[in-house]
From Swiss-Prot:
Keywords: Membrane, mRNA transport, Nuclear pore complex, Nucleus, Protein transport, Translocation, Transport. This is Nuclear pore complex protein Nup93. Belongs to the nucleoporin interacting component (NIC) family. It comes from Danio rerio. It is found in: Nucleus membrane; Nucleus, Nuclear pore complex. Disruption phenotype: Mutants can be recognized on day 2 of embryogenesis by the presence of necrotic cells in the tectum and eyes. Dye mutants die on day 5 of development.
Length: 820
């Protein structure tokens, strides 16, 4: 800036200062240079803020404009957009605008319907999701349970003996999950099933299982099977309804009678062992029989005079103790012998006991019973002689609240005493303290006392006996099954009861092992027999499938919740789990005949079972196994259908030793040879697809091996793709009839064919350059033919109604261009 400019600026400043001084109302502001600089910076920043937005807009326009975008037009469009919702009126609706009002109402109704539908859809989806989660969780629980069960102590590997097994014709290779007890039981199950499948008279399964106990040399197991045989030795009435049979009075009376007989026989054996073990103290002599046995036993049990004894003695022993122990041994005649010897001291008891002894069901008449009970309440309730009180309570079935601990000091004695007091008739005259039903006794033992009272964890056989002798078979089995080392015994007791139709089964497979069902009488429990058997076999079905199959045969008449036969279902799962297809279901020989498997002896219609297993294998994605099984079942359609699915993904691959393609190729060729030799054919379209895929596999094998001319001959013979313009339309029309398995490989077929043509083209050009004497006309014709064939492939690829994979078309065009 020149001097004149500064002078003019100075003049203007002085003029401004003069004008400011002329205004006296305004105060003077004195600023130093720093304050003036700060004020100038503030003014400058305001100016930049206003201009920066314009500068940014200009820069954005330059950037986007270089990419062909009109930012001014875009800004206008963005400003014109409205944030109003779809169903909101853009303009306020006037009160008199009926059409607008109706439109709004209609839109609101639609919106409400959509919202309600959305809400219901989400609720339904949540419900389906919850149900699916519950089903999956139940399946996971079952798998966890089965896994835990299979990992128990008894699941340790057990080496089989070298001697041949009765259960299988050929010993199971490797290790077995069965222990020695389970092996012994499985042999008896094999013997039992063999008799049945061969049409022989059905043997007694209880006797077969009891023979296992003899070989085990275990007193508890032997007594258990003796008890099971005793309790099941009742008159079996054919009945479709097991529950009705089990709760009938006659059947329950028979159970009580058998239980008493077992307890009495056991006690008599105990007295014999005691007496013969202490002959010097017992002083056994006289006429052999229960009376002399009891007298000798009392010499050991009651060596000193009994305090509080009443009514004298017989041959030096308290009379009531003699009567009680004769009754405890189950010999009423011996007890009557004692009564006769002491009848003068016993009053009316002889008459009452004679009536009791002659009664078929060990029950006094109501009148006599009332007299005895009255006498007991008046005279004997507080008697000092415990044996006298016990005998009166037995004969009169009274005072059920007294446990007679001085006499019945063992669980077996207590049980025998209570079973003697059980009543079955509807006697309204009896007071509650004088009447005990079997259901009341069952409840007392199972629910009121329970496992802790009987120390069941330390004495499992005792608690099992308590439940079993009171006809609580299902609860007894379920308890014993929970004890790992005794599980095999529980399962085989259940099998014995099942065969005798004495077992109450759960109505649903999903029920717990022991359950109560609505509508059943009190104290009736049901056992989930199917689950029991499946849990037991789960441990060894993968290592010992033959043995597992023997147990599954017991389920041949059972159905699951969908009505499916449980035997077929279990066999299906067993085969897939163990993968022993040939051993269990049979094997197909080279001539197409079927070598029988283990299943043949159990089922008349093995084809149905094999088809079921094949279907399961197919559903699980085990297609190769399913093919073999469907071929066993002579279902050619399914064999070829699955083979087509297996071959389709691999036919274009390079064949290598032990590869998937090589294995599937050998499998397919073997099937084709068998079917051709035996005249077997499937449904026409499936059959044609199978043989076409085999031919395509041959084509690709020749192509990958470098045999170009052979591969060309194969593809020309198949007539799958056109090799001339005249055949394009025909091949496009035929393409619609091909299955998806063939269509999926079309890209590879076209590329391979074009590669063959291109290779032949290059070879032709090389031959022309190397042999100049060759007729030019022939070379030109061959060259033209190859280009026409390549053009036909390009035309075909463009006309077929199928989207080929990736860059197939581009690669085809590229090779065709190289040929031109």
């Amino acid at each position: 800036m020149d001097t004149e400019g500064f002078g003019e600026l100075l003049q203007q400043a002085e003029q401004l200062a003069a004008e400011t001084e002329a205004v006296s109302e305004l105060p003077h502001v004195e600023r130093n240079l720093q304050e003036i600089q700060q004020a100038g910076e503030r003014l400058r920043s305001r100016t930049l803020t206003r201009t920066s937005q314009d500068t940014a807009d200009v820069k954005a326009s330059i950037l986007l404009g270089s990419r062909g975008l009109d930012i001014f037009h875009i800004s206008q469009r963005l400003e014109s957009l409205s944030a109003a919702t779809t169903f909101e009126p853009l303009e306020p609706v006037k009160d008199t605008d009926i059409q607008g009002f109706l439109k709004n109402e209609r839109d609101n109704a639609l919106l409400s319907a959509i919202e309600e539908s959305r809400r219901r859809t989400f609720l339904l989806a949540e419900e389906y999701h919850r149900d699916s989660m519950l089903v999956q969780w139940e399946q996971v629980k079952q798998r966890v349970l089965h896994t835990l069960l299979g990992a128990g102590e008894d699941a340790l590997d057990f080496s089989q003996e070298v001697e041949p097994s009765f259960v299988s014709e050929v010993g199971v290779p490797g290790r077995s999950a069965l222990d020695s007890v389970e092996v012994a039981y499985s042999r008896q199950i094999y013997v039992f099933n063999e008799k049945i499948v061969n049409g022989h008279l059905q043997p007694n399964l209880g006797d077969l299982c009891a023979s296992v106990a003899e070989s085990l040399d275990d007193k508890n197991v032997s007594e258990m099977w003796l008890m099971v045989k005793q309790m099941t030795d009742v008159l079996l009435v054919p009945a479709k309804d097991t529950l009705k049979s089990r709760v009938s009075v006659d059947m329950q009376m028979a159970f009580v009678r058998q239980a008493l007989q077992f307890l009495e026989n056991s006690y008599k054996n105990y007295t014999l062992v005691t007496v013969f073990g202490n002959l010097h103290q017992a002083q056994l002599g006289g006429v052999p029989g229960t009376y002399q046995l009891v007298c000798s036993f009392l010499n050991i049990k009651l060596p000193t005079p009994l305090p509080g004894r009443q009514d004298g003695e017989v041959e030096g022993h308290p009379v009531w103790a003699l009567i009680y122990f004769c009754l405890r041994c189950g010999d009423l005649s011996a007890a009557m012998q004692v009564v006769n010897k002491a009848q003068h001291q016993l009053g009316d008891f002889k008459i009452w006991f004679q009536e009791y002894m002659n009664s078929p069901d060990r029950r006094l008449s109501p009148a006599t019973e009332n007299k005895l009970r009255l006498h007991y309440r008046r005279v004997l309730r507080n008697s000092a002689d415990p044996y006298k009180r016990a005998v009166y309570c037995l004969i009169g079935k009274c005072d059920i609240g007294d446990n007679h601990g001085e006499v019945a000091d063992k669980t077996e004695d207590y049980l025998w005493l209570k079973l003697n007091q059980v009543c079955f008739d509807e006697d309204g005259s009896s007071s509650p303290q004088d009447r005990m039903t079997l259901a009341q006794l069952q409840k007392q033992l199972l629910e009121d006392y329970g496992e802790s009272h009987f120390s069941a964890s330390h004495q499992p056989f005792l608690y099992f006996q308590v439940l079993f002798l009171t006809a609580q078979f299902e609860a007894a089995i379920a308890f014993l099954f929970r004890v790992e080392r005794l599980r095999s015994h529980a399962v085989h007791v259940a099998l014995v009861l099942y065969e005798l139709k004495l077992l109450l089964k759960s109505s649903g497979q999903s029920a717990q092992l022991l359950s109560q069902e609505a509508g059943d009488p009190p104290m009736v429990r049901r056992l989930n027999f199917i689950r029991l058997l499946m849990l037991y076999t789960r441990k060894f079905e993968s290592t010992d499938p033959r043995e597992a199959l023997q147990y599954f045969y017991f389920l041949r008449n059972e159905k699951d919740s969908q009505g499916e036969n449980m035997f077929m279902r279990c066999v299906s799962e067993l085969v897939i789990e163990s993968r022993e297809f040939d051993m269990l279901l049979g094997r197909l020989e080279k001539d197409g005949s079927r070598k029988p498997g283990v299943i043949d002896k159990f089922a008349g219609d093995t084809r149905a079972i094999i088809t079921k297993v094949a279907s399961e294998a197919e559903n699980k994605g085990l297609f190769e196994e399913a093919v073999k099984l469907y071929e066993l079942a002579k279902n050619a359609d399914k064999v070829l259908e699955l083979m087509n699915k297996l071959l389709s993904p691999v036919i274009a691959q390079v064949s290598e030793p032990q590869s998937n393609k090589e294995r599937l190729k050998n499998m397919a060729v073997a099937i084709a040879e068998r079917y051709r030799a035996n005249g077997v054919a499937g449904e026409k379209s499936v059959d044609n697809t199978f043989y076409l895929l085999l031919d395509l596999m041959t084509f690709f094998d020749e192509y990958h091996a470098g045999h170009i001319d052979r591969a060309y001959d194969v593809i020309e013979r198949l007539k799958l793709v056109p090799l001339s313009q005249d055949s394009v339309e025909e091949r496009v029309a035929a393409f619609r009839n091909f299955s998806d398995e063939v269509r999926h490989n079309l890209s590879e077929v076209l590329l391979a064919t074009m590669n063959i043509l291109f290779t032949q083209y290059k070879r032709l050009k090389g031959a022309a350059a190397g042999t100049p004497g060759r007729p030019q006309r022939t070379l030109e014709d061959r060259d033209m033919l190859l280009r026409i064939q390549a053009r036909a492939l390009i035309t075909f690829a463009g006309m077929i109604p199928y989207r080929m994979a990736g860059d197939t078309n581009a690669r085809l065009v590229q090779m065709e261009v190289l040929m031109n």
